[in-house]
Amino acid sequence: MQAGGATAAATPQVAGAKPAALKVSLSLELRCAKPGPAAIAVSLPHAWRVPNTVARRAVWIDTSHPDAVTVSRHTVTLQPRTPTGTCTMIAPGTIKVKFTRAAKLGNPRKAGRYTVHASIGRQDFSAPVSIKPA
């Protein structure tokens, strides 16, 4: 995946599945292979079922849970853990955001191709997600 690219996949991929997991991979320039202090906003299509709250332990950013998770309509905003130490290496990398089934997301009730949007700082991403008939 090139810098600025994104992929997303729901598990299961079946229409109406709830709870469903969602994995979003974002490719961008990273400082020391970490997302940095900027919040990660993941915007789900209106057909997706999103709870009013999501527990931070129900979400992973790479290998750790975010420090905070907030929900506003269909946008879930994640605050990554603050990096520790000093590092100046900037290189292309991939951040993997995973909403486990414990996040209680629900797939759209109709099969089709949907677009998940994400942003980190000034960088915007979009990725298609295919939902199959039940």
Predicted feature locations:
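Ser/Thr/Pro/Gly-rich, low-complexity intrinsically disordered stalk/linker tracts of secreted
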Residues: 1-134
